[in-house]
Amino acid sequence: MLKRQFRSEDEFRDFFFGEDAERELIYDNIVNCIDIAISEDKDTAFFAELIVEGDEMDINCHRPEFKENLENALNFYIENEIYEKCKNVQTLIDKL
């Protein structure tokens, strides 16, 4: 699970959506958290605990959303030619 603290909303937006967003790290985290949830037969995957300007928020998804999130990660890996991660994601999709 990703744990991050941001001093401002701008810093938060830049991390997730900015030009230099760490998208591979974000998708790796999503895949890993869903993998854990599937392995432990959990209904929820917890992606992140974030603090933005002192306000805490949790980011998670429920089992019906696992496939969509994994497909988004798979598309990201394909578009960015990170093929070595595709098989693991497809294996997780097949488990659902």
Model-identified regions with their sequence ranges:
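Alpha-helical structural elements
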Residues: R7, E11, E22, D41-K42, ...
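Long, acidic/serine-threonine-rich intrinsically disordered regions with weak helical/coil propensity
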Residues: M1-F15
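Short, charge-rich, low-complexity alpha-helical interaction segments
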Residues: R13-H62
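Short, compact, well-ordered microdomains
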Residues: R63-L96
